[in-house]
């Protein structure tokens, strides 16, 4: 009986720790997101050209990434961490900052750019399955919009095509 009680206590402590990590990650993401959204808006305002009379923004402005898709994604530093942009999934009411470089410790804070670049259409974003991060992705139906906004304010829109859940040991 003592061993059973010990195991039950350990399980409860582990569950409490996981919930605490989830909340801490969510709180951190919210705080960083506020700063990044402000930085993105500031970057947009600084980079907009003066438009000739009668010309639309789309006609007058070609983003740097179109001219040079191999360029590094711009980063913004918040609390000593470099971020690549913001991931938005409207169907899940999810807005998350994306850290520019993947590591296990970074995953505890926010989703991370695991590999690739949004400019080359091969970016992979990794995140924990915290409810405040990617924990609800399994509920995302096919055809839903996923938006990534880089730190220059360029918006990239996608639709989910299929859902694949990988083994934790893949």
Each predicted region: which residue ranges?
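Solvent-exposed, non-transmembrane regions of membrane-associated and secreted proteins
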Residues: 2-170
């Amino acid at each position: 009986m003592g061993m059973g009680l010990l195991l039950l206590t350990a399980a409860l402590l582990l569950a409490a720790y996981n919930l605490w990590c989830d909340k801490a990650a969510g709180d951190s993401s919210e705080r960083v997101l506020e700063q990044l959204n402000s930085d993105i808006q500031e970057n947009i305002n600084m980079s907009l050209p003066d438009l000739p009379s009668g010309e639309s923004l789309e006609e007058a402005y070609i983003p740097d990434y179109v001219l040079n898709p191999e360029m590094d994604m711009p980063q913004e530093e918040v609390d000593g961490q470099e971020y690549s942009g913001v991931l938005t999934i409207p169907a899940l009411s999810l807005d998350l900052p994306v850290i520019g470089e993947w590591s296990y410790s970074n995953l505890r804070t926010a989703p991370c750019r695991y590999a690739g670049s949004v400019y080359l259409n091969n970016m992979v974003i990794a995140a924990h399955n915290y409810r405040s991060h990617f924990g609800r992705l399994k509920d995302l139906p096919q055809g839903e919009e996923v938006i990534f906004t880089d730190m220059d304010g360029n918006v990239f829109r996608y639709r989910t095509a299929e859902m694949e859940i990988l083994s934790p040991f893949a």
